[in-house]
A protein has these predicted regions:
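Bacterial N-terminal signal peptides that target proteins for export
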Residues: 1-8
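Alpha-solenoid helical repeat scaffolds
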Residues: 5, 13, 20-440, 462-471
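Short, flexible active-site recognition loops that position polar ligands and cofactors
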Residues: 436-439, 451-456
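Alpha-helical oligomerization segments
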Residues: 447-448, 455-469
Length: 471
């Protein structure tokens, strides 16, 4: 029901545009004169309409509908409904009477009756294009497939009606079929006269289809027509970020946020602004904008993750880790393995930073625990064991205890089964094991690993020198 009400509200304005008084009728000037009195002198207007309907016009259904529409345009729904009914009583097969009746129903928030009346108008006159369009609009936000079916019927019957492609674009947009929506709008804009709303919708469709260059051009055209259009100013900023035009994006952001009290800002606006600031290394300002986004909407855990990334770029690892923990805690359900991996790697990088040497044991322990979970969750992937090996190398920098040995061996066992294994990773695993056995003075075993490296990378200087030293 709520969707129907929203649809009705959006259509009330369209109803008046799609059903104007027929031009050229001999009584059109009198209707317009009387209509001008409806608001300020309804009695005089009623009397004037009554005079028009005397004599030969007593049963003029076209005139009755024109009068009814004049009342509807002034918000007089009851009077409009009365004239629509009078027209139907005189000629129950007059499609325009049902079209007006449908418009009145829309104004009264009765979408079911409106769609029924529009359908009846189509049944009575298959060339009543407005009825197809209005029926499609009623269902656009409720059952878009019904809208689509009706519009396709109209397009087959009236391929030159430029309004069809515009409405198809709106329906496809509602259905999330942005590629088709873009094509429909392109077809419309080639022959139609775009409005501010058309430019806005088309620019959005281009953005959603990742046609950022094209979207930029449409945004510029739209802003020429409507320089205060909030959505177009938003898209200017969004497009520039996607195109990596960061300076232009910051200029667009300054324009977009020039009125800080605008109630139409959404959390994503602050996220995009923050990303622009981050891209230009204005990290403190970026953090402030990310936090504004969180204040506005805490239902998007990825914001915590982006905050963590900014802190990491500042090498503020304690804050980066704290923000990442906030991210993991805000997730609904268990974190993905990729999330755990990135958290483990963050702790590893913190452990390698000499500025936090006093916290190194804490970071190492956290990283080791997390990478152990990764190895357990995806046993066929080398990453968990490989990064555990790196972490334990920090615990045993001289390789005297061989703390990393079992993890490099486990990673190597997986990697050797993969034809596309990274050469650099294979070299690292074999290098550690070669050096470990060298320290243990087990030279034959050490040579095995150094030779494996030369099989992978014949020009590897470290392996060559190690073998020369053993000889």
């Amino acid at each position: 029901m709520r969707k129907y009400v929203l649809t009705v509200v959006s259509l009330c304005f369209a109803a008046t545009l799609w059903g104007q008084t027929p031009a050229g009728s001999e009584w059109t000037p009198q209707v317009q004169q009387a209509a001008a009195m409806i608001k300020d002198n309804p009695t005089a207007a009623s009397e004037a309409f009554g005079e028009l309907l005397k004599g030969k016009n007593k049963k003029n259904t076209e005139l009755l509908v024109a009068i009814g529409r004049a009342y509807l345009e002034q918000g007089k729904k009851e009077e409009a409904a009365e004239y629509a009914q009078r027209a139907k009583d005189i000629n129950g097969k007059y499609a325009q009477a049902y079209l007006l009746s449908g418009d009145v129903a829309l104004a009264l928030n009765d979408a079911n009756k409106a769609s029924s009346d529009y359908n009846q108008a189509i049944y009575l006159d298959e060339n009543c294009n407005e009825a197809y369009l209005k029926y499609a609009s009623v269902y656009k936000g409720v059952d878009p497939q019904l809208s689509l079916d009706m519009l396709m019927r109209l397009q087959t019957k009236a391929p030159d009606d430029i309004r069809v492609n515009k409405e198809l674009g709106d329906v496809y947009y509602t259905m999330g079929q942005y590629g088709k929506a873009k094509e429909a709008y392109e077809a419309y804009l080639k022959v139609g006269k775009p409005t501010e709303q058309d430019y806005t919708r088309y620019a959005m469709l281009l953005y959603l289809n990742k046609n950022y260059d094209q979207s930029v051009n449409i945004v510029k055209k739209g802003l020429t027509m409507a320089p205060d259009n909030h959505v177009l100013k938003r898209l200017a900023m969004y497009n520039d970020l996607e195109l990596k035009a960061y300076d232009a994006g910051l200029e667009a952001a300054a324009v977009f946020f020039s009125n800080p009290n605008n109630p139409d800002f959404v959390y994503l606006d602050y996220v995009y602004f923050a990303r622009l600031l981050e891209a230009t290394k204005q990290y403190d300002e970026a953090l402030a904008q990310f936090n504004k986004a969180l204040t506005m909407d805490k239902e998007h855990p990825d914001i915590y993750k982006e905050i963590s990334e900014v802190y990491e770029k500042q090498q503020n690892y304690p804050q980066a880790i704290a923000s990442y923990k906030d991210y993991l805690g805000a997730l609904k359900g268990e974190p993905e393995v990729s999330d755990l991996f990135l958290f483990g790697r963050l702790n590893y990088y913190a452990a390698t930073d000499s500025a936090y040497r006093d916290k190194q044991p804490e970071f190492i322990a956290e990283a080791d625990t997390i990478f152990a979970q990764v190895a357990t969750k995806v046993p066929d992937n080398y990453l968990g064991n490989f990064w555990r090996a790196r972490v334990n190398s920090l615990r045993d920098p001289e390789t005297t205890q061989g703390l990393a040995k079992p993890y490099y061996e486990a990673a190597l066992a997986i990697l050797t089964q993969k034809a596309d294994a990274s050469k650099s990773i294979l070299v690292e695993c074999n290098s550690y094991l070669g050096y470990y056995y060298f320290v243990k003075e087990d030279y034959p075993q050490s040579k095995i690993y150094w030779n494996k490296i030369l099989e992978i990378d014949p020009g590897n200087e470290t392996a060559t020198k190690a073998l020369q030293g053993i000889k």
